[in-house]
């Protein structure tokens, strides 16, 4: 499959870089959280509140199965999608996985800078929770095909495109 799959922590820039990559490569952008919101006709926050996290993770698995048929897409995943049900391996079969690595200190700055009411796992700007999440997820994220330190927007885009072309053998 010739897709680019962006993974990483919440606030790592997956949606922002995904939008720009889709323009550069002339690929459609798929945001897994947006797809789930459209399927359920509810926000992620509402889904978590009404049905719980397990239900949400089941919906992510449904999305992964749909994505197996896609090609020439930039896929921006929710931060937890690669973590559950060994989804990282499914994502690697869907396309070229890119872990957008952002230092924890930078993630905390980004979280504190804004109120993230739409992100149920980041409610109350709980830096300790973010730190725990980071520690628990990093090992799985690092199984991606490539790791891009996303502290500079333009540099990250260039590195992702180069790594993707190399992976494709171009």
UniProtKB/Swiss-Prot annotation:
Keyword Nucleotide-binding among UniProt keywords: yes
Coiled-coil regions listed: none
Biological process terms in GO annotation: amino acid biosynthetic process; aromatic amino acid family biosynthetic process; chorismate biosynthetic process
Keyword Transferase on entry: yes
Compartments it resides in: Cytoplasm
The organism's place on the tree of life at top rank: Bacteria
Gene Ontology CC terms: cytosol
A GO molecular-function descriptor: ATP binding
Predominant location: cytoplasm
Cited InterPro entries: P-loop_NTPase, Shikimate/glucono_kinase, Shikimate_kinase/TSH1
Binding annotation for substrate: 33, 57, 79, 137
Cofactor(s) needed: Mg(2+)
Pathway(s) annotated for this protein in UniProt: Metabolic intermediate biosynthesis; chorismate biosynthesis; chorismate from D-erythrose 4-phosphate and phosphoenolpyruvate: step 5/7
Role noted for this protein: Catalyzes the specific phosphorylation of the 3-hydroxyl group of shikimic acid using ATP as a cosubstrate.
PANTHER family, alphabetized: SHIKIMATE KINASE, SHIKIMATE KINASE 1, CHLOROPLASTIC
Self-association state and partner proteins as the record states: Monomer.
Listed name of the protein: Shikimate kinase
Lineage: Bacteria, Bacillati, Bacillota, Clostridia, Eubacteriales
């Amino acid at each position: 499959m010739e897709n680019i799959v962006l993974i990483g922590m919440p606030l790592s820039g997956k949606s922002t870089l995904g939008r720009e990559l889709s323009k550069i490569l002339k690929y459609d952008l798929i945001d897994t959280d947006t797809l789930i919101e459209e399927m359920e006709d509810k926000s992620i926050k509402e889904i978590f509140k009404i049905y719980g996290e397990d239900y949400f993770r089941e919906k992510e698995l449904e999305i992964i199965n749909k994505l197996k048929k896609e090609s020439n897409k930039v896929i921006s995943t929710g931060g937890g999608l690669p973590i559950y049900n060994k989804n990282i391996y499914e994502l690697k079969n869907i396309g070229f996985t890119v872990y957008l690595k952002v230092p924890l200190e930078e993630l905390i700055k980004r979280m504190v800078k804004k109120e993230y009411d739409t992100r149920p796992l980041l409610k109350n700007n709980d830096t300790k929770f973010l730190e725990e999440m980071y520690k628990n997820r990093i090992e799985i994220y690092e199984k991606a095909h490539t790791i891009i330190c996303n502290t500079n927007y333009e540099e990250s885009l260039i590195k992702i495109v180069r790594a993707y072309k190399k992976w494709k053998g171009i």
